């Protein structure tokens, strides 16, 4: 079984590789290759000179939210060669909200539809996407998100303690901040918390956003490859994490946000970092408040209260840390993703 996973640039950060392709496709293929000698794969950017050669070699072409004319041309070649085409979706790619840097992709919906029409199978990451698309695309299959926990636990064995001697919080965000009405409340809560707890720092991984200058306690690190990011989470030995996302109060972006995935919970759980999460549906579906995370409304008092609670309660942090890890290991392991993708590959071979 030979697979060509087409890489692309991020829709929300110009000039950098897509994290969706890495987390959703190549990580799963790497796991499948690690556990089975029957799977071989190659991944190349869509503009690479060797893409045509990779198509000749492969049995199957996998795309992930691609929208370029170049991707269409490659898919058309794959179709003529008799190759099977799988198109993966993990967001509502048919329209981006105004807060998103991906809103510039809204004029490429016809390109996406062209690629979907060329595809033998369309895979989606969650039940919400499945329900919204199944009537239009009957060739739809669910391939859930998952974490290759053991891959990163090998590194965790080198870490001597769960928390650094210097208390640190981690915040990860691709694109702009995914909140509208509650954004000022979040930033106010952070400013008050860090003014009271000047021994704490906030490590940020992701794309720059306009409000960074107002957060002098924030240490910015640009987005990095998925493997490197996971290693940074483990080596960071963070006290806890924050994950803001607009919920019911953000009417314009609610439908889009409901189609997102709780990958940050999966990442933090696998890295044993306890987290505070907005009470958005993607997190209320996997986080039990006070058990494997904290859930907060997107207002000033809720965010500040959760920050103070986790900062002051070591036993709660340890409880959440262990429960989240166990939950990800049991319910969100990459083996479920691999099993689902293998079924799709075998059906489309």
Label each PLM-derived region with a short phrase.
Residues 20, 298, 315-346:
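A charged, aromatic-enriched C-terminal amphipathic alpha-helix characteristic of glycosyltransferases
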Residues 178-181, 227, 231-270, 276-287:
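Nucleotide-sugar-dependent
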Residues 7-28, 148-236:
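Conserved catalytic-core segment of nucleotide-activated headgroup transferases in glycan assembly
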Residues 56, 76-77, 103-122:
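Membrane-proximal helix-turn-helix segments that form the acceptor-binding/catalytic region
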Residues 1-65, 71:
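N-terminal pre-catalytic "stem/leader" segment of glycosyltransferase-like enzymes
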Residues 128, 146:
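Carbohydrate-associated surface elements
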Residues 262, 287-290, 294-300, 309-315:
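Conserved acidic donor-binding segment of nucleotide-sugar-dependent glycosyltransferases
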Residues 78-95:
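Active-site proximal beta-strand in glycosyltransferases
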